[in-house]
């Protein structure tokens, strides 16, 4: 029987942070859980970041992932928005790192290409493919993106391990 690995995928954001946990057994993928963390919008930035950090820590304790993956920051037209997204990414990355988990980072285009086959896929296409790759999974756009990040990591960790075995 193949070794089972749990991966926590994170789609960072200050308003909505998508998350998803998948199980990988050989080439089989299955969804464990997914959802969205919504920090209080009226709270100061520091409190919203603490909410994200604590929520991801709770997810790590509840679902026991072996590894985590998060979407890389992209260059936004608004520098202030990009900086705040960077803060959210850091808060989300610290919780699994503190628990001793490796945290991988993937560009959005690579995630889309891994799941849909094209880096230019839209959110609806990503969500549709997540539903196909993880049958029975009905996720919101943010949670589907997080599951896609976890799937991307599963594909890349498998390719890396196959490459090292050659």
Swiss-Prot record:
- Gene Ontology annotations for the cellular component aspect, listed alphabetically: cytoplasm; Holliday junction resolvase complex
Q: Where does Mg(2+) 1 bind?
A: 11, 142
| Cofactors (names) | Mg(2+)
Residues that, per the record, bind Mg(2+) 2: 71
Statement: the UniProt record of this protein carries the keyword DNA damage: yes
Keywords for this entry? Cytoplasm, DNA damage, DNA recombination, DNA repair, DNA-binding, Endonuclease, Hydrolase, Magnesium, Metal-binding, Nuclease
Give the main EC class.
hydrolase
What is the first-listed, main subcellular location in coarse terms? cytoplasm
Note on cofactor: Binds 2 Mg(2+) ion per subunit.
Q: Please verify whether the record's keywords include Ligase.
A: no
**Enzyme Commission numbers on file:** 3.1.21.10
Extract the signal peptide range.
none
Q: Which family does it belong to?
A: Belongs to the RuvC family.
List the HAMAP family: RuvC
Q: What does this protein do?
A: The RuvA-RuvB-RuvC complex processes Holliday junction (HJ) DNA during genetic recombination and DNA repair. Endonuclease that resolves HJ intermediates. Cleaves cruciform DNA by making single-stranded nicks across the HJ at symmetrical positions within the homologous arms, yielding a 5'-phosphate and a 3'-hydroxyl group; requires a central core of homology in the junction. The consensus cleavage sequence is 5'-(A/T)TT(C/G)-3'. Cleavage occurs on the 3'-side of the TT dinucleotide at the point of strand exchange.
Its protein name is Crossover junction endodeoxyribonuclease RuvC
* Organism, as annotated: Maricaulis maris (strain MCS10) (Caulobacter maris)
Gene that this sequence comes from:
ruvC
